[in-house]
């Protein structure tokens, strides 16, 4: 099968990029490929053959139709305007066109210096590359909108961070890499016509149904608000903390993008900060919904030359409803509730209060709850609590609520076990795979990827146990 690549970004947005080629690594070699995604995209097995070396995965070759470029954008970082940013180490190799009309960017991360590298070296290390590959595929398996990881190479190139680490590259695939920061860039350069040009591009390629609408820009922005709200609501329900929700890390399609110092909750700790560089806790777990709105407000400001302030504010006012609707539905699913009743929020808040007091594991709590039976006062979750009387009191109210549903246990458990994962990507699991990979053993990386692809199946191995003490003390930063 021949892969088809287009150059829409290059052809339609000439002021939004710089052309350049990737800079290969020393002795680069393929260490992982995403076989299911490769099959979905029609990527021939021959491209992964060892005799072809690192090839396109290591920036050593281009496929027909590829025309590499680095995109320029700006953004707000930790609440402050950061000015011009851009693809500092990533290169958009091409836009794959599928037969069904869908299009996917192939973006090579760690591909070397670009005009937007600023003080960086344009490289990515094996540690951060593995973390992104694991997180993007874990989130996909959980049903959360995300960029994808297609392939990964390591090398003998030394990269200097807190320590010397091997250089690596990741082929990231997404329907689009357009960020809020793309719009901010030209707004703050006082070039509103280019902001509108980008909006036209995004609508033309990703919202074609809106092209002929008189108020297409407003309808598009309203959908961006909704998508952003729904994605962040999904993060909150699985206990995912992004860590660096700068506006340049916000996808216009509502994808989860730029996996850096992320983390999944172990103990239920609403003020959890996964990024040890986030001294003020701006991007703590509980702050993510508010930050999402703040970022949308920055995007709205960039669109103000061609959408009225009144219309933008009305669209922003829809954010909270969209987020709470999505969050409420998913949390009812997690509790096994098929209908909505007035006291449901109190029921959930009661469980959360217990979990905070007892430092309960977020993922294990909901998974064990999904095995409860409404006719039994016993629950496999009970043994997780020290204060059994407090749990029994809450569980009695929960069972009473389940009886109102008039849904049998099998149907309810099926729904609950389809939204309450048994397995999430805990930092200690990623760290174990990283350490073994750095020692040359990719076995754990493959095993962990395979496990994360099936998160809703009960397991008996250590992938689903609470983290060891050392795993809870892991610190993750923006260093990558």
Swiss-Prot record:
Gene Ontology MF annotations: AMPylase activity; ATP binding; magnesium ion binding
Entry keyword Manganese: yes
InterPro entries in alphabetical order: adnlytase_SelO, SelO
Residues the record lists as binding Mg(2+): 249, 258
Pfam family, one: SelO
Binding site for ATP: 86, 88-89, 109, 121-122, 172, 179, 258
Alphabetized UniProt keyword annotations: ATP-binding, Magnesium, Manganese, Metal-binding, Nucleotide-binding, Nucleotidyltransferase, Transferase
Annotated active site: 248 (proton acceptor)
Record field: catalytic activity: L-seryl-[protein] + ATP = 3-O-(5'-adenylyl)-L-seryl-[protein] + diphosphate; L-threonyl-[protein] + ATP = 3-O-(5'-adenylyl)-L-threonyl-[protein] + diphosphate; L-tyrosyl-[protein] + ATP = O-(5'-adenylyl)-L-tyrosyl-[protein] + diphosphate; L-histidyl-[protein] + UTP = N(tele)-(5'-uridylyl)-L-histidyl-[protein] + diphosphate
Family matches, as HAMAP family: YdiU_SelO
Function (record text): Nucleotidyltransferase involved in the post-translational modification of proteins. It can catalyze the addition of adenosine monophosphate (AMP) or uridine monophosphate (UMP) to a protein, resulting in modifications known as AMPylation and UMPylation.
Sequence similarity: Belongs to the SELO family.
UniProt xrefs under NCBIfam families: adnlytase_SelO, PRK00029.1
Name used for this protein in its record: Protein nucleotidyltransferase YdiU
Gene that this polypeptide is encoded by: ydiU
